[in-house]
Amino acid sequence: MEDAGFVAHYPEEGRWGLGVAAFEVGAAYLRHDPLERLARAPIQRLAAEVAHITPAVALLGVLHGRETLYLLKDAPSTPVTIVAEVGVRLPASLTASGRTLLADLPAAQVRALFPNAASFVDRTGAGPMTLRSLNLLLGEERLRGWAEEDGFISEGVASVAVASHDHDGRPAASVGLTFRSDQADRGARAVLAAAARRCAREITRRLSGSGAGPRA
C-alpha cells in the first residue's frame, strides 16, 4: 500500500498515516494534509540550508487550475517581503512554483488550462501573456531543470522552483525559494535551485514510498 501511495510514513512523527493516493477520490484540497505533513520538515531544512547564501523564503506549492496555491512557507530570520503566503493563489504562468509544475504536464493539458489570451494575468508587465510565449518559457525551463522568475509577481523579487512527483511520476508539488533580486546573482541562483532540487527529490521519495527514513 505504501508503494501505491495509499499509506505514507511520517518520519518526524514516527508513525504511518493515509497517503496522497488515498485522497484522490475526493476534492483536491483533501490531498493537502498528507502532502503538507510529508513536506514540512524538508521545507524547513531547505530554508535553513540556504540561509548562508541569501535570505530566502522556502515555499511548497500546488497547481489549482491556472493558479499556484501555496501550502507551506518557511521564512528566514532576515525578513523577505513577498506576496506568497499559505493559502494565497497566484497565476501559475507567472510563478516559478507554478511553471515548474506546468512544464511536467502534457502539452494538451497546458493548452486546456490556457485556451486564450484571457487566461493570462499581467501583474508587473513581465512574464508570458500568450500560450506560445508560455510554451517557449516552459521548454527552456524544462531543459534547465528548474523554473525561474524575476519581477513577474513583484518588482525586485525573484524565485526559483523545482517539481516533486507522486507515486505515479506526476508533478505533485513545487519546492520554491523566493529572494530579493539584487541579493542573488546567476551563480547564487543556480546554487539555490540545486538546493531546491534536493528538497524536491526528498519529497518525491516520501510521496513515492521509496524509503521511510529522513534525508541524511
Predicted features by range, described:
Residues 1-37, 201-209:
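N-terminal helix-turn-helix
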Residues 112-121, 200-216:
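Cysteine/selenocysteine-centered motifs that mediate thiol-based redox chemistry or coordinate metal-sulfur cofactors
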Residues 11, 63, 166-167:
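Short, acidic, Ser/Thr-enriched surface-loop or helix-capping motifs
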Residues 23-25, 119-120, 180-184:
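A short, flexible beta-alpha/helix-coil linker loop
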